[in-house]
Amino acid sequence: MEHSRCLSCLILAALLSQVNPRALEVLEAEDKVILKCNSSITLLQGTAGQEVSDNKTLNLGKRIEDPRGMYQCGENAKSFTLQVYYRMCQNCVELDSATLAGLIITDIIATVLLALGVYCFAGHETGRFSRAADTQVLMGNDQLYQPLRERNDAQYSRLGDKWARNK
């Protein structure tokens, strides 16, 4: 449960230079965020909360609403400033070690099955002859060029019948 709380929200409490951590506290009660101070709390910027008791306790609202802002505890020269920033992860999935191991093992099995399928279908072609049988002799008798044939059977060969052809 503690891990899910750490993963579900991010609290950034940056105390400025003269801050006493005991003077201003951030409490999480159920699903609400509450600020407690020894003296009065003043909102500098951000989410305006509801005062709970005599301006020493401030309810910032629900954690799911991402309360954030700068708050000042005290009004004199010894005032403390606190910055609160909540960010709830609403679409997150808790990822523990068993889930991560399951994902990795499933990925490895799927990859092996895919490689096995490719090997079975593409690796063995039956009825295939050797490479020597694939080669054809295009021109016999060591000829460099193939002699041209007469072309009287083509579509446009009848147009030039009036002129003599050089053979």
UniProtKB/Swiss-Prot annotation:
It holds the Pfam family Ig_4. Residues 1-21 form the signal peptide. The keyword Signal applies. It is found in: Cell membrane. Its main location: membrane. It comes from the Eukaryota. Glycans are attached at N38, N55. It is a single-pass type I membrane protein. SUPFAM superfamilies: Immunoglobulin. GO terms for molecular function: transmembrane signaling receptor activity. Keywords: Adaptive immunity, Cell membrane, Disulfide bond, Glycoprotein, Immunity, Membrane, Phosphoprotein, Receptor, Signal, Transmembrane, Transmembrane helix. The TCR-CD3 complex is composed of a CD3D/CD3E and a CD3G/CD3E heterodimers that preferentially associate with TCRalpha and TCRbeta, respectively, to form TCRalpha/CD3E/CD3G and TCRbeta/CD3G/CD3E trimers. In turn, the hexamer interacts with CD3Z homodimer to form the TCR-CD3 complex. Alternatively, TCRalpha and TCRbeta can be replaced by TCRgamma and TCRdelta. Interacts with coreceptors CD4 and CD8. Part of the TCR-CD3 complex present on T-lymphocyte cell surface that plays an essential role in adaptive immune response. When antigen presenting cells (APCs) activate T-cell receptor (TCR), TCR-mediated signals are transmitted across the cell membrane by the CD3 chains CD3D, CD3E, CD3G and CD3Z. All CD3 chains contain immunoreceptor tyrosine-based activation motifs (ITAMs) in their cytoplasmic domain. Upon TCR engagement, these motifs become phosphorylated by Src family protein tyrosine kinases LCK and FYN, resulting in the activation of downstream signaling pathways. This is T-cell surface glycoprotein CD3 delta chain. It comes from Ovis aries.
